[in-house]
Amino acid sequence: MAYHNHLSQDLPLHHFTDQTHHQHQQYQSDQPDPNSKPPEPHHSFQPAPNWLNSALLRNFTNTDTNPTNSNNANNNGGGVSNFLNLHVTASDSAASQASNQWLSQSHRPILHRNHSDVNDDVTVAGDSMIAAALSHDSADLKPDSILNKNEGGGGDGGVMNWQNARHKAEILAHPLYEPLLSAHVACLRIATPVDQLPRIDAQLAQSQNVVAKYSALGNGMVGDDKELDQFMRNYVLLLCSFKEQLQQHVRVHAMEAVMACWEIEQSLQSLTGVSPGEGTSATMSDDEDDQVDSDANLFDEGMEGHDSMGFGPLIPTESERSLMERVRQELKHELKQGYKEKIVDIREEILRKRRAGKLPGDTTSVLKAWWQSHSKWPYPTEEDKARLVQETGLQLKQINNWFINQRKRNWHSNPSTSTVLKSKRKR
């Protein structure tokens, strides 16, 4: 930053020190008496070097000589805060006070540096105070963390925290942030117990607050960042691939667990002769929660909640039970989707065979009439069959099958037919 009609960058250091020391003495001589009237406001046109060095030296003098006045100036919004034109609210007084102390400590060796170093320190201090005024919750935006790192390591810690906060703001302002968040939440939902899902929804409801905190940092940023675009695209693809791998992992291991449980049930049934459905603890349904609770109480009293072999409690917890129920539902859905086409084909085949085996009602009435008229000997000749084919429009095979089935259905209901057959057999 260049200031016209002021000191140049190459001003000798001894001249800078003498002139600022002269202004320092003039400022101490101009200090008003508390019992006297307030002095007249100083004229705005000051001699060289400039108002920047004067303001810095005034803050340094107030901090070292009179701590009470320094604290009052900080609380009233004076000092460096007014110098940087940062309007901090009353709730941020602690943060602004800490920032002013950090700024005053960092300007102690100011007389041993040139004019460009002074400008750099003011810029870093301004960024730190902006971060302190933006948020009190984020670890990257907390003024305490910035102050601690600056006091221990010079000024690099505050700059690093400030850069981390800006990187987060750039990610939140990126167009791919919503797909990134959705992919991340989808990975979290896999194999999560049903009773734990509301916690994820509650955290998603608070995401707007986080976006609002970092939105102030991303207002003046340039939107074209190829490195950030590539990072966002690759990370979204990575999360989507990770989601598929997690789903496959859960399904395979869940299927193995179900098959192992089925094998254990079969082995137990072969040893005891009792099916799992006949026992009192066959399932973990909601109707048996009371029985499970009573068994758990007895188990806790006898073994203090742990088994002697160190394998943990034998009775599943509520989270494990909800996870088992979710695995059952997912397996049921997968089986339906996998065998849906085969089930539909089998059902259509059964219905088609049923429709093919049934004759129309008008044709069966003709066949039944012939059956009633020839009840004593219900065996049509070839001529009778040819005439029935013409009357009904059926095939000869269908007529033969109908008479065979009809004789089977009425085998014992027609005594005359049975006597005729017996007489023929005797001959």
Curated annotation (Swiss-Prot):
CDD domains: homeodomain
PROSITE patterns: ELK, HOMEOBOX_1, HOMEOBOX_2
Chief place where the protein resides: nucleus
Ubl conjugation keyword on record: no
Entries under SUPFAM superfamilies matching the protein: Homeodomain-like (SSF46689)
GO aspect biological process, one term: regulation of DNA-templated transcription
Family annotation (SMART domains): ELK, HOX, KNOX1, KNOX2
Keyword Nuclease among record annotations: no
Example of a GO cellular component annotation carried by this entry: nucleus
Polar residues: compositionally biased ranges: 272-284
Compartments, record wording: Nucleus
One MF annotation (Gene Ontology) recorded for this entry: DNA binding
ELK domain ranges (all copies): 330-350
Residue spans binding DNA: 351-414
One protein family per Pfam: KNOX2
Protein keywords: DNA-binding, Homeobox, Nucleus
Tissue: Maximally expressed in sepals, petals and fully expanded leaves. Also expressed in other flower organs and in developing leaves. Low level expression in stem internodes.
InterPro entries referenced in this protein's UniProt entry, alphabetically: ELK_dom, HD, Homeodomain-like_sf, KN_HD, KNOX1, KNOX2, TALE_homeobox
Stretch list, region Disordered: 19-49, 272-291
Family the UniProt entry places it in: Belongs to the TALE/KNOX homeobox family.
Stated name of the protein: Homeobox protein knotted-1-like 3
